[in-house]
Regions:
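Periplasmic/cell-envelope proteins involved in peptidoglycan metabolism and beta-lactam response
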Residues: 1-294, 311, 320, 395-403, ...
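Extracytoplasmic
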Residues: 57-60, 67, 75-78, 119, ...
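Soluble non-cytosolic domains of exported or imported proteins
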Residues: 59, 87-94, 126-130, 176-180, ...
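Beta-lactam-recognizing serine transpeptidase/beta-lactamase-like catalytic domain environment
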Residues: 73, 202-213, 261-326, 330-562
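Acidic/histidine-enriched alpha-helical segments
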Residues: 110-120, 156, 249-262, 348-352, ...
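Conserved SxxK-family serine transpeptidase/carboxypeptidase catalytic domain
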Residues: 124-140, 150-167, 171, 223, ...
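Residues at or immediately flanking beta-strands
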Residues: 148-150, 223, 252-254, 346, ...
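Ligand-recognition elements built from short beta-strands and adjacent flexible loops
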Residues: 482, 519, 533, 562-738
Length: 738
């Protein structure tokens, strides 16, 4: 080949190689420019995501306190077990699945499946207690597992008092979201704001040094201070449960204790409460057994959900009912405010009235003859109040029905408040009006009713019922205090005072006397309403028995509504069924709240006395001291000096009661048996107690009633006690209605 040809070929090859290199480098430069300027941000994000992990840091849910700062709901530290599938190798996958399955009680195959996800973060189990967390840490250490399992601090809701106040408190779900009660209503306040932790990972999935960590702190939720008083609530729940059992109540009972002047709810209870620590478990044994006996399937699921909804439902806020004769306080206040009646306005009271062709009976066969307006309240005469309703007329009746807040929700800070059902003035017939006047046509919620009656006796003011007094931040500083300013005044202070005085008379000598408490100037009104919807649907007669009372009548502080839905015991009347629960609860609540007794001269004559201390005195001196105290001494033994006495010094004992004195040990072991003291007249009760060698202290209608019958005793029949022991016996007026 010629030399020139070789040189040309070499030059051409060199040029081609240079050109190819230039093109290659150009492409690289273009790619670098594109990566830097066009896709740089996207690729940077991908790189960060591949090397970092973001973990949510839970905020601690705020605490719920009672009015005295006792914690009713709080959050305890638990742990989340989190898998990091991207860092679980085939080598340790089976070891991890086996170990966690044994520790957590989760199916191994489920863990294996979860460990194969294309993810850096997969929650395996929440709410793991610290001892279980420690087991997992030991397992990781024993098997030298550095990545693939994370343990994150979390919080679990805890209710230290169990089922206490559960329909008010509510509960939270597995994700700590409020699902009922205060927990639901104030969920956004209690929840707080989650933080996050961003950490960098190396090639094997373990954390890189601290400088690669970024942390955004969580903000804990605010706390709530309730108006609920734990002591008041316990009194309420215990006595309500006793009343439900005693009266064989079919559809649960409920009660509300409220500050008359501020609307603060001191106690709110519904029988059959659930445990918010385990809210999905059915608390009613009968309901639970019914569900358990059903085969798995749609019907069982439906029954289970119905039972859960029932126990979670707050009847005092969500249910509506005919308030019965308690509503006469509203009709009466309206008529008195309008100047249509005074205490002494006379009414003719046959046993029925015929209205638009419909005969409407009073509760007393034969009627009352003639009653004044005040006597109409104290005798709970339907005939009187049909006439009072007609005096008002539909327009004025509805005007006050609306003014007392009965056409709209109260706005109480609890979820699920029900809506009242009522006739407006335009669609109310004369019959509707007449029957509504004594509480049997329109339907309201218990919280509406107690708020309305509070206005009757507190000077005429509609207050805002509420269960939260304050909101506190994480440091305990006050964020918000509930405004207790009344909404409006619906009747004058004069009308209010006069109505309170009539209602006090009613609790002393009228149909509400089963709620009477000596010294506390109680006022009250009973209610017995027929469940007309049940009658129409089933043909059965079912009733709601209620009692709404307050104290002290001369300066009302506390109001209480007791409500029993379908009582099937000895009576269904509000006075006999709900009155004793009111009296027993208020007798415990009022002294606790510092309400002072003021006795009338008549009450002073009937008061129990305190046993003087005669221990170490001679027999003669002891007898003399007891006689001066209007007590009867009874001596056991042959000694000359008193070595013990029953009742003990300072104990309450009825006037003319017996104090047993021991001069030696010969009689100290001579116990007596408490007899059955219920279902008797006062005279027969005294006789049975005397024959048994015990004393009785009487409460309830025995102090004011005309035909009282004993219905409870503080020490069960058959119990062995020392001679002279005092047994408290409660009395009711069984023929009282309302």
């Amino acid at each position: 080949m010629a030399k020139g040809t070789t040189i040309r070929m070499w030059r051409r090859t060199t040029f081609l190689l240079v050109a190819l290199n230039l093109i290659g480098f150009g492409a690289i430069i273009v790619s670098l420019i594109r990566l830097q300027l066009v896709d740089g941000e996207k690729l940077h994000t991908m790189a960060v995501e591949n090397q970092t992990q973001e973990t949510s840091l839970s905020a601690q849910r705020g605490t719920i306190y009672d009015v005295n700062m006792k914690p009713l709901a709080k959050s305890a530290t638990v742990w989340q077990v989190v898998l990091e599938p991207a860092f679980i190798t085939d080598k340790n996958r089976d070891v991890i699945a086996s170990g966690l399955s044994e520790i957590l009680g989760i199916d191994k195959d489920k863990i294996l499946e979860q460990s194969k996800k294309k993810s850096y973060y997969s929650v395996l189990k929440r709410g793991v207690e610290t001892d279980v967390k420690d087991e997992i840490l030991k397992f990781k250490s024993d098997h030298k597992i550095e990545s693939g399992i994370r343990l994150l601090e979390d919080y679990k809701r805890y209710y230290p008092y169990g089922a206490f106040a559960s329909t008010v408190l509510g509960f939270t779900g597995s994700d700590s979201q409020g699902l009922a009660g205060v927990e639901q209503k104030y969920d956004s306040v209690l929840t707080g704001v989650s933080g996050k932790l961003v950490t960098a990972k190396n090639a094997i999935g373990t954390d890189m040094p601290f400088q690669y960590e970024q942390k955004v702190e969580s903000k804990n939720g605010d706390s709530l201070v309730l108006t609920i008083d734990e002591v008041v609530q316990h009194f309420l729940e215990e006595n309500l449960a006793e009343g439900v059992q005693k009266n064989k109540v079919g559809e649960r009972g409920g009660a509300i204790v409220m500050n008359v002047k501020t609307g603060a709810i001191l106690g709110m209870a519904v029988s059959g409460a659930f445990d918010p620590n385990n809210p999905f478990a059915i608390s009613d044994p009968t309901e639970a057994a019914k569900v358990a006996s059903m085969p798995q399937g749609e019907e069982r699921t439906k029954e289970l959900r119905a039972a859960q909804d029932k126990q979670w439902r707050n009847k005092m806020v969500g249910d509506t009912y005919h308030p019965g004769s308690v509503f006469k306080t509203i009709t009466g206040s309206a008529a008195m405010e309008e100047g249509l009646v005074t205490e002494n306005t006379p009414f003719n009271c046959p046993d029925s009235l015929t209205i638009s062709g419909q005969v409407v009976h009073d509760w007393k066969h034969g009627g009352f003859g003639h009653l004044t307006f005040a006597q109409g309240i104290c005798n709970s005469s339907n005939v009187v109040f049909m006439q009072v309703g007609q005096k008002l007329g539909a327009d004025r009746f509805f005007k006050y029905f609306d003014a007392f807040g009965l056409t709209q929700k109260t706005g109480i800070d609890l979820p699920g408040e029900g809506r009242s059902q009522y006739y407006t003035a335009n669609n109310m017939s004369i019959l509707d009006l007449s029957v509504a006047a004594f509480g049997q046509t329109n339907s309201v919620t218990p919280i509406q009713m107690v708020t309305a009656v509070a206005a009757v006796v507190n000077g005429g003011y509609i207050v805002q019922p509420h269960v939260v007094a304050q909101i506190l931040d994480d440091s305990g500083n006050i964020v918000k205090t509930t405004d207790t300013t009344p909404k409006r005044q619906v009747i004058s202070n004069d009308t209010s005072k006069r109505m309170a005085a009539i209602l006090q008379q009613n609790a002393t000598t009228g149909t509400a006397k089963n709620g009477y408490l000596p010294g506390y100037r109680v006022g009250g009104k009973t209610g017995t309403s027929q469940k007309t919807e049940v009658k129409v649907k089933t043909g059965k007669d079912e009733y709601i028995a209620s009692y709404c009372g307050f104290a002290p009548a001369d300066d009302p502080q506390i109001i209480m509504l007791v409500y029993y839905d379908e009582p099937h015991g000895d009576s269904y009347y509000g006075s006999a069924v709900a009155g004793p629960t009111f009296a027993k609860t208020m007798e415990e609540i009022l002294p606790y709240l510092g309400v002072q007794r003021k006795y009338t001269p008549t009450e002073l004559e009937k008061l129990d006395t305190s046993t003087p201390d005669v221990i170490s005195k001679s027999v003669a001196d002891a007898k003399n001291a007891l006689t001066k105290s209007k007590l009867v001494p009874k001596v056991y033994g042959n000694g000359k000096t008193i070595i013990s006495q029953v009742p003990e010094p300072g104990k309450s004992i009825p006037q003319n009661g017996t104090v047993v004195l021991f001069t030696d040990d010969s009689g100290s072991s001579t116990d007596v048996t408490v007899p059955n003291l219920t279902g008797m007249t006062l005279a027969n009760t005294n006789k049975a107690a005397s024959n048994a060698g015990i004393n009785i202290s009487i409460t309830g209608a025995a102090l004011t009633g005309t035909n009282p019958i004993s219905n409870s005793q503080s020490i069960a029949a058959g119990t062995k006690v020392a001679p002279g022991t005092v047994v408290t016996v409660g009395f009711i007026e069984p023929d009282q209605v309302g």
